[in-house]
Amino acid sequence: MEVTGRLFIWAILAVSCRAQLNSTAAEGRPRCTASLGGANLGETHKALILNLNADENCTWTIERPENRSIRIIFSHIQLDPDSRCENESIKVFDGRSTSGPLLGEACSKNDFVPVFESSANSLTFQIVTDWTRVQRSVFIFYYFFSSGTTIPNCGGYLQTLEGSFSSPNYPRPHPELAYCVWHIQVEKGYKINLNFTELFLEMDEYCRFDFIAVYDGPSTTSGLLKQVCGRGTPTFESSSDAMTVVLSTDYANSYRGFFASYASTYVQEVNTHSLSCASDKMRVIISKSYLQSLNYHESNLQLNDPTCRPSVSNVVEFSIPLHECGTIKKIEDHTISYTNIITFTQSPESAVITRKRHLQIVVTCEMEYNSTVEILYITEDDVIQNQSVLGKYNTSMALYESGSFENLIQESPYYVDLNQTLFVQATLHTSDPSLVVFLDTCRASPTSDFASPTYDLISSGCSRDETCEVYPLFGHYGRFQFNAFKFLRHLSSVYLKCKILICDTSDHTSRCNQGCVSRRKRDIPSYKWKTDSVIGPIRLKRDRLVNGDSGLLPQTHEAEISKQPLSHLHLFSFMVLALNVVIVVTATVRHFLNRWKDHGYQKLQVY
């Protein structure tokens, strides 16, 4: 018994010692030795240089009484280049403490200039460094601003294939405390060439005060191409069809700013011409070298509507809306096609002869099964050349909160109550106002591959469920509602797939105008323009309590069953462990009892 007591005491001491070590490690957090040099974080604007040591954990709060927001810019960050962001970083919080919403995080691995804005008049930033002893410094610039005030010509969206922009007030000195963002977005298949014909900002080795940041993509986190300042004429080239340019200035030393122009280059090789079709437009690309071989100039090209002009770069591009620019729509045998003609302007009426071949480029988009077919042919002295490729309809389907179909539900998976009314809308994304959407079939399944079992909500345009209500035809939208259910002997996931038919409103014999018909009467196989849309999963709310909110949910009952052997193995292992513990305890008790008996009957030694 004495040995048992000692073992028990040692166990208690070991546990208490371990708890004390954990507590010491948790409480022994790095302290902050970095200094702001007496700076007042209540000033309207301030530039700060922070020199940091290893094992720092520093937090500062910027705050003023007036109701204005704060913009903080970390224009130069020198942290441990080998440290992970989890161990060494800068975190910025919206509010007076680190318990506020996290606005963002920056570390040595980031490829952008970190800029954050508060929602109100207070902002907190925290800098944590690891144990590595390297030189660290962070340049911080912040200022208060009113969110409702703007600087003229400060940023914007540029969507043409070529253009130009400049700093506000150019060529006069740029304004103070300016933060301007220009987004350049051109058509797919192009890349952007940006050229600064003049750049005159405050000079600094690290461009900490006034600078321009150029990003290779659609946002300020797309990947920094370069941060520039001073004087020069830098050039940049994007890797895609988007580029972002930022101008940031402080409160002193304003100069002329900059002037920049950009042009687009079509990346893919086009020997003669190409055509692609979307739900709202036709896109024709013509090679300039092809035109030159015919002794034509791009300025002589025109559509059925001569006012619709092409965009010219290293290629000539026509972006032709399906219901504008003289596009002709034709309905034949339940097939919709869109046609336009690119021609070359005729010789002057005073001319008597010509040695140029008469050339026409006829472009047609024809709607096909679950896709669109593009057909392009050229007539050249009565010689026809054909070309065809494939595209797809642009459709989507989503859940809405009510029958007004105003508030889209973004949550996925979407948790519902059993028998709750659900509102579904299928949408055709097109600029053609004369098209209408018809819901031919809508089917539910417990799995995303729609294997057996399935359950029909709508079939042949008819409601097959007592709670399902199909709404009347409504332009580009097909709508219905039904009450939530679950599949027996399966998990509570439900996926929906709808077959959508697209008709022209002027075609009174179309399938869309027939409504609900029996399977014997309908003639869908001859229909060329239909497509599928899928949404899901929809799950019961009680499964949220079981599975949590992670969204990583099992999709079939078989998947759940496949995990059961692992659970049985865990149970068996636990039982074996418990049995071993019982055996050890029993043996120990018997050992001490036997020793106690030996001591109890030990014969006294006779002297």
Swiss-Prot record:
One of its GO terms (cellular component) is zymogen granule membrane. Residues 276-519 form the ZP domain. Residues 20-568 are lumenal. Glycans are attached at residues 22, 67, 195, 419. Expressed predominantly in epithelium of uterus and oviduct. The chain crosses the membrane at residues 569-589. Keywords: Cytoplasmic vesicle, Disulfide bond, Glycoprotein, Membrane, Repeat, Signal, Transmembrane, Transmembrane helix. InterPro entries: CUB_dom, Sperma_CUB_dom_sf, ZP-C, ZP-C_dom, ZP-N, ZP_chr, ZP_dom. Residues 1-19 form the signal peptide. Residues 590-607 are cytoplasmic. It is found in: Zymogen granule membrane. It is a single-pass type I membrane protein. Residues 32-146, 154-265 form the CUB domain. Disulfide bonds join 32-58, 85-107, 154-180, 207-229, 442-498. GO terms for biological process: female pregnancy; hormone-mediated signaling pathway; trypsinogen activation. Its main location: membrane. Induction: By estrogen, tamoxifen and growth hormone. Repressed by progesterone and by the antiestrogen ICI 182780. The keyword Transcription regulation does not apply. It comes from the Eukaryota. It holds the Pfam family Zona_pellucida. Localized to zymogen granules, where it functions in trypsinogen activation. May indirectly regulate cell motility, cell-cell and cell/extracellular matrix interactions. This is CUB and zona pellucida-like domain-containing protein 1. It comes from Rattus norvegicus. The gene is Cuzd1.
